[in-house]
């Protein structure tokens, strides 16, 4: 899809090259903002309230799926538009990003949901049992049919975020961890990527809890995320390095911390349903994060240009699409900063 059909060209640059830009929040949204702006020649400082491990942030607990076709089942068209552009940016900036596709499977009792998923999405090929076994030998004989989305990808959040931070520094930017700041504390143009921490300035922002479990086993080998149809929400098993797998993810409309017993049972049950060998896997970690979401579950870039005050850009509301959308939203911000271009589906001017 052509992103430029939604753009309105502005009159001039908002921040000239080499001008200071302060970005608050070093999660996936802020990291991509910092990377593209630093590579464009701006003097970027990225502030993060957490330490470099960033266990407090939503990014730490993310799935890292780059799956615009699968997400189209329950998402607005803008998610597909931005997601397709983001895939190109992932390939450009991090060429080693794996694009092995996604596989959707279901048990016979969930066949109606499986067929609905197929109707609601594009970009897939139907596989029979032999086709599933060909691309995922560990699943041989486990499922009779699946939907294969060959152009989708995935990243490992706890590895890719430090890599983005390294590239920001290599591009001339700086990162200050353990440094909690407010927009009024910063120099130059301010880009607010605090996620749920910005709720007081970004109403009606809410937190949607997503829970995950990290397990380890060498009894199962997978090359791509596996989505298992489920009556309440799609559950998935995502392969990670060193024989590890991420199980996710719930989507719960409350902001409590931790993982509930019910959610843990559903996530572990999904893994067992994909392959019984997961029953002997070791549980390494479990936790939850709060996805920042507006009432329509769509991302927004809010631009504030008061007559006498600090210019601020707030990027928020990525909901469950943080890794998918962050690069495209960063590019929209860059286009606005460099030439005043506005995307009228995403950007709001105050």
Which residue stretches match the model-derived regions?
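Helical element adjacent to the flavin cofactor pocket in flavoenzyme catalytic cores
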Residues: 147-182, 193
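Glycine-rich FAD pyrophosphate-binding loop
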Residues: 39-58
